[in-house]
Regions:
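Extended interfacial segments that mediate partner engagement and assembly in macromolecular machines
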Residues: 26, 75-144
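Long C-terminal interaction/binding lobes of large macromolecular proteins
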Residues: 129-204
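S-adenosyl-L-methionine-dependent methyltransferase catalytic core, i.e., the SAM/SAH-binding region
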Residues: 8-16, 27, 33-36, 158-171, ...
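Cys/His-rich Zn2+-binding cysteine-cluster or related metal-binding knuckle/ribbon modules and their
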Residues: 2-9, 17, 30-92, 198
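Conserved phosphate/pyrophosphate-binding and hydrolysis machinery centered on Walker-type P-loop NTPases
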Residues: 19, 38, 51, 63-64, ...
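Conserved NTP-handling cores and scaffolds of large molecular machines
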Residues: 25, 37, 52-55, 65, ...
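Short, well-ordered alpha-helical scaffold segments within catalytic/effector domains
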Residues: 12, 55, 67, 122-129
Length: 204
C-alpha cells in the first residue's frame, strides 16, 4: 500500500507490529491521532516512553510495578502463606479482578514449551526455591492455563519441590481444557480458586 507520506507509512508500520492489529486498522489509528489535538498524541507518546523506561519488575514476584516491590507484595493485608503461581501479569490481573484471593503471587514469565524452545531455565523457578527458603509459605497454588504446556510446567515444579513441607494445590478445572487463564470469566475463575484441589501425581 502506498502512502502520501513516509512519516505516515512509518507510523503505520510501527502500529501494525502490535498484536492483533493489521495495516488497515493501523492506518485508521494513525489517521485518528492526526485528527486529535497535538497534546493528545504527545500524551500517548509520553505514556509509551514511560512504559518502556520507568516500569519495574517486582523483586519478590516479578509483577510489573512502579517500585522495586509491588503493591501486592508490600501489602500487610495479603498473607505470605499462600503463593499463587501464574504464567504472566495478565493472569494476576484476572485473578485480582475476582476479589477472591488474599495471598501473593509468583509470575513464572511463561510456561515450559519445547516446541517454542522454552525450558525450565527460562522461567522464574528459582524464585520458588527462594520463597521456600524464607519459610513463610504454607501452600503453592498452581493457576496455570489448562493446556499441555501449563500441565507440564506444574508437574515439573511439583516434582522438583514435592519433598518439602509446603502443600501444592491447583485451581479447580472450571476452566475449559485448552483455555488460557486470562480469558476465563471472573465468576468461574473465582470459584476455581476457592474450590482448588490438592495437587499430586495422581491428581494434577
Amino acid at each position: 500500500m502506498d502512502y502520501p507520506s513516509k512519516v505516515l507509512a512509518k507510523a503505520v508500520d510501527e502500529i501494525s507490529g502490535l498484536p492483533g492489529i493489521g495495516r488497515k486498522t493501523a492506518l485508521r489509528l494513525a489517521l485518528h491521532l492526526l485528527k486529535q489535538p497535538n497534546s493528545r498524541a504527545m500524551s500517548l507518546g509520553n505514556s509509551l516512553i514511560s512504559l518502556v523506561n520507568d516500569i519495574k519488575y517486582c523483586k519478590e514476584c516479578h509483577n510489573f510495578s512502579d517500585f522495586e516491590i509491588c503493591e501486592i507484595c508490600s501489602s500487610d493485608k495479603r498473607t505470605d502463606e499462600l503463593i499463587c503461581i501464574v504464567e504472566d501479569v495478565r493472569d494476576v490481573i484476572a485473578i485480582e479482578n475476582t476479589g477472591k484471593y488474599t495471598g501473593k503471587y509468583l509470575i513464572l514469565g511463561g510456561k515450559i514449551s519445547p516446541m517454542e524452545g522454552v525450558g525450565p531455565n527460562q522461567l522464574n523457578i528459582p524464585s520458588i526455591e527462594k520463597k521456600l527458603n524464607e519459610g513463610k509459605v504454607r501452600e503453592f497454588i498452581f493457576a496455570l492455563s489448562a493446556t499441555m504446556e501449563g500441565d507440564t510446567t506444574a508437574y515439573y515444579i511439583y516434582k522438583k519441590f514435592k519433598n518439602t513441607e509446603v502443600n501444592f494445590s491447583s485451581i479447580a478445572r472450571g476452566i475449559s481444557v485448552g483455555d488460557e487463564l486470562e480469558y476465563a470469566d471472573e465468576i468461574s475463575l473465582g470459584r476455581s480458586i476457592m474450590n482448588r484441589l490438592p495437587y499430586n501425581e495422581g491428581n494434577p
